[in-house]
Amino acid sequence: MCALSREADAVLLLFDEFWDEAGDPYGRVKSDTNFYITGRIGKHNVVLTIMSGMGTNSATYAAVNLRASYTGLQLILLVGICGGLPRIGDKDAYLGDVVVSKQVVGYDNMLDDGTGRPNADVRPLLAALDTEFMEKRLKMAAAIHLKELQQEAKEQMRRAEYHYPGAKNDAIYPPEYSHKHKDLCRACAENPDFFCRSAFQSSCAEIGCEPDKLIPREHREDLPKGADFAPEIFIGRLGSGNTVMKSGLDRDRIAAKYNVVAFEMEGAGIGEEFPCIVVKGICDYADSHKNKIWQNFAAATAASVAKAILAWFPSSSDGQYEPPPKGMTWYSLFSKY
């Protein structure tokens, strides 16, 4: 499900074939207003659906319609971008790394009641992916798919840039250090928890965020822009809500209380009755310093991990990769932040 085109564009670069180049051959039920793109990724027939908007309500509506039109649906992958914690468990997390949902909980009205458990059909796969052995395999496969995506984007002369933005653009401030004008702005000065629209639309350099306030971190490698980057993959509990997380203090408070590793906006809208795995690339640190520099690259790393996951999901295909008849088994790729 894509509320932003950038997530869908990244996913579509990893389609191996399209079944709908001459128009939609499968149709949809009368009440379904979703838009679909169908094709093949690896050994699976896939359908990508684009949401009408952001948030859990839009996700619920799109998922229900999808299930009605594609009754043979076996797996939903909710693929896109998210805000992540700078440290997950005992590891530093960096922009471009990918999180995979072990559980999804709504942080707008979060209750630790066990909700958000993955569907029973995907629990064995998630348990396998959580092993060190499969994690290494997944990471290696995702790195290959990322290079394929970048090459395909180049060949198609895509406007979007999917290469690594560079370690120097991966910076983080303390959670209490807000992204706001440091002087000459009454709105930013009057409320410590508020910053003006102009600040929100400006870069850290433009509004005077002080470089000496940055948290010093050792990157895995001091990679320049455009370098090869193999994303780390974290499997854990994701927070999901209808509002964008953009406070370092709120991020850390909620993460500590509910043991979440990242924040996104659609996963909680897809109920336990749907076989769903959320795969999101970290494009910011869920604080007030968020920007769009990493969004395309994070969408690309998430799409690459999603394709790697699909390779280990059982297929009902007989090995003949042709446009399937209506009623065939389908796998859905959703993407959004």
Q: What role is predicted for each listed range?
A:
Residues M1-F334:
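Intrinsic-disorder/coil detector with helix-boundary
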